[in-house]
From Swiss-Prot:
Organism annotation: Citrobacter koseri (strain ATCC BAA-895 / CDC 4225-83 / SGSC4696)
Superkingdom of the organism of origin: Bacteria
Claim: ATP-binding is one of the keywords in the record: no
Keyword Cell cycle part of the UniProt annotation: yes
Pfam families from the UniProt entry: SulA
Name listed for the protein in its UniProt record: Cell division inhibitor SulA
Gene responsible for this protein: sulA
Stated family: Belongs to the SulA family.
Record region (FtsZ binding): 106-112
Database matches in InterPro entries: Cell_div_suppressor_SulA, P-loop_NTPase, SulA_CellDiv_inhibitor, SulA_enterobact
Lineage: Bacteria, Pseudomonadati, Pseudomonadota, Gammaproteobacteria, Enterobacterales
Length: 169
């Protein structure tokens, strides 16, 4: 999995350890927008990284919103992944311009612990700022999922960011 230079930008999160501590209780989660760039031929890697966080957020009383481009989440997958079926909402077949605006509106409401949206293009600074402000207002997390093909990943050089955690060193 590749993490873009915009990943994990938030004015309220100063350290990885602090982020994990804040996620652990319901009303102390600060707004966060993170971009996850992953290879389309290796979706399991992304699931392994995000599922524990989504499971933890599923313990909150708020919803989880998935804004998917075409695919419909299967009930079986949601249940087998350990996510609360009664708290997962999905809206599919949104165009990219509607996905961004829908994410901003949903994050702002405070009704969702997490909003996950798929976008093919990188966010502009202004778009990221709008998302971050909405996440702060709604005390929610937003994940921008950006798939790349295996071919594009092999032929293109990424100036990425490696995230090291002092929890594991």
């Amino acid at each position: 999995m590749y993490t873009s230079g915009y990943a994990n930008r938030s004015s309220l999160f100063s350290s990885t350890a602090g982020s994990i501590a804040r996620v652990s209780s319901e009303n102390t989660t600060a707004g966060l927008i993170s971009e996850v760039v992953y290879r389309e031929d290796q979706p399991m890697m992304t699931q392994l990284l995000l599922l524990p966080l989504l499971q933890q957020l599923g313990q909150q009383s708020r919803w989880q919103l998935w804004l998917t481009p075409q695919q419909k989440l299967s009930r079986e997958w949601v249940q087998s992944a350990g996510l609360p079926l009664t708290k997962v909402m999905q809206i599919s077949q949104l165009s990219p311009c509607h996905t961004l605006e829908s994410m901003i509106r949903a994050l702002r409401t405070g009704n969702y612990s997490v909003v996950i949206g798929w976008l093919a293009d990188e966010l502009s600074e202004e778009e990221h700022t709008r998302l971050a402000q909405a996440a702060d207002e709604g005390n929610a997390m937003g994940f921008i999922m950006r798939p790349v093909s295996a071919h594009a990943h092999a032929t293109r050089h990424h100036s990425g960011l490696k995230i090291h955690s002092n929890l594991y060193h």
